[in-house]
Amino acid sequence: MAQSLSRLWTHLIFSTKNRFPFLSDKTIRMDMHRYLATILREQDCETLIVNGVEDHVHALFALSRTNAIASVVKEIKRTSSSWVKERSPKLAKFYWQGGYGAFSVSHSNLEDVIRYIENHEEHHKRMTFQDEYRAFLKAMVLPMMSVTFGIRWNADSLKA
């Protein structure tokens, strides 16, 4: 095959440092989501949706065939952090957390994930970010998370 083809749908989740609610202003939060989508497109990642709440963000996009997920995440965090600090003196201490979660999504599940991200604010009236992330870990069965986050996972540590 003379060409390279790739279509890796990715559900990316990351939070503000220490889950501080930096994005509590709805206007800034919505602007941040639009800006993150722009950065993803600039990284050649077809972006379907970006949404979130005061302390974390979800994005659903097709990972570019020429970029690694770590490079894409590093760029969107770096660029958006600088952008938001320039927007408001109140956000001078804004930072993203060091880690992230990136999960592959089957094409057949795209609509469900889009709906989940669209209704994210409503979802968090029933579930905390920590509980949500535990559910992702449990569903995805990711024992390698101990390497990424330095936490020893077992069945008890994934209980809500």
Language-model regions: role of each:
Residues 1-159:
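Basic nucleic-acid-binding interfaces
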